[in-house]
């Protein structure tokens, strides 16, 4: 028989650096999950990713206080900022442009995000990423 799910917890944790401090500790503690067990498992699973990259994670907590978790790819905004070499997007994206990204960079980001995106092909996913880039104040070239 399948275990009964008691909660889903969605967090964004830096890859390779999960620790019991907020936001991880309080979110897991209120559901009775072993926090250190999660931190060790998460850090082991994300050790191949770029250290410090924000990694969305969905934790499924079961009624017996056991858990499973699924990691996602880093947010498009993080990947776009890294590709453009900027620290933050524009506060006025329609007026102030803060950087440039090429079509090749968009395709590379779309390949990275492919498991978490919907879309018929890589080109459609790249167009979606291009929309995110424009809303951050980046100029899309090509």
Curated annotation (Swiss-Prot):
One of its GO terms (molecular function) is structural constituent of ribosome. GO terms for cellular component: cytosolic large ribosomal subunit. Forms part of the ribosomal stalk which helps the ribosome interact with GTP-bound translation factors. Keywords: Methylation, Ribonucleoprotein, Ribosomal protein, RNA-binding, rRNA-binding. Part of the ribosomal stalk of the 50S ribosomal subunit. Interacts with L10 and the large rRNA to form the base of the stalk. L10 forms an elongated spine to which L12 dimers bind in a sequential fashion forming a multimeric L10(L12)X complex. It comes from the Bacteria. GO terms for biological process: translation. The lineage of its organism: Bacteria, Pseudomonadati, Pseudomonadota, Gammaproteobacteria, Aeromonadales. The keyword Ribonucleoprotein applies. HAMAP family: Ribosomal_uL11 (MF_00736). It holds the Pfam family Ribosomal_L11. It comes from Tolumonas auensis (strain DSM 9187 / NBRC 110442 / TA 4). SUPFAM superfamilies: Ribosomal L11/L12e N-terminal domain, Ribosomal protein L11, C-terminal domain. This is Large ribosomal subunit protein uL11.
């Amino acid at each position: 028989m399948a275990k009964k799910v008691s909660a889903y917890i969605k967090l964004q944790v830096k890859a390779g650096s999960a620790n019991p401090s907020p936001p991880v500790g309080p979110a897991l503690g209120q559901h009775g999950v072993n926090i250190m067990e999660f931190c060790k498992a998460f850090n082991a699973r994300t050790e191949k990713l770029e250290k410090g990259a924000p990694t969305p994670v969905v934790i499924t907590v079961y009624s017996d206080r056991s858990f499973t978790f699924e990691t996602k790819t880093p947010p498009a905004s993080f990947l776009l900022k890294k590709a453009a070499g900027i620290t933050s997007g524009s506060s006025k994206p329609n007026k102030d442009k803060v950087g440039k990204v090429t079509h090749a960079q968009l395709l590379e980001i779309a390949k990275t995000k492919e498991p978490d995106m919907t879309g018929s092909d890589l080109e459609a996913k790249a167009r979606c990423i291009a929309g995110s880039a424009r809303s951050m104040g980046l100029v899309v070239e090509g």
